[in-house]
């Protein structure tokens, strides 16, 4: 596959470089999905209630998308996550996507570190490579569906396997080699 950056992605990269030399962008996880004493209210945000505007970055977790579920591990419908990513883009903000995927070897959650061969099992030739490739395809299809009504692909910051220098996730530092990671 050849990957070509869209003009929107190029614009995002340029803006991130510009911001990094002047300051930072404030973010909040699931900001428009739930907050203190509310859940699912359209357009609501605790950050906006306190500060007068939405955060520059809103993060969402794609966990359970790989399983074909309609709800994320945070119990948010993926259809709402998609809608909120598009809303954030329309406001000029950035959406960050994490993916606390299940442990493909044991069936446990991301924090199941009971086996040190999970990463090895998803690599080409591994027992769970095909399963993992299918999971990646589901996430890829979701990200590719993030388009405006005019067909513009919405750029996102995708951060799978984050916090890899710790060992609390099955992809963590003590659970695989740097080459496997």
Predicted regions and their residues:
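N-terminal module-boundary/linker segments of secreted carbohydrate-active enzymes
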Residues: 1-63, 68-75
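Substrate-binding cleft of extracellular glycoside hydrolase catalytic domains
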Residues: 63, 67-181
